[in-house]
């Protein structure tokens, strides 16, 4: 996955049930 903006990279992952950072 390509680096995203902080706001876009920060999302709620339903599978992990937590907040994940897409770097």
UniProtKB/Swiss-Prot annotation:
Region (Disordered): 1-23
PTM comment, free text: Binds 4 heme groups per subunit.
Highest taxon, organism lineage: Bacteria
Gene Ontology, cellular component aspect: periplasmic space
BP-aspect Gene Ontology terms: anaerobic respiration
Binding site for heme: 23
Entry's localization field: Periplasm
Keywords: Electron transport, Heme, Iron, Metal-binding, Periplasm, Sulfate respiration, Transport
GO molecular function: metal ion binding
Role: Participates in sulfate respiration coupled with phosphorylation by transferring electrons from the enzyme dehydrogenase to ferredoxin.
Protein name (database record): Cytochrome c3-1
Lineage: Bacteria, Pseudomonadati, Thermodesulfobacteriota, Desulfovibrionia, Desulfovibrionales
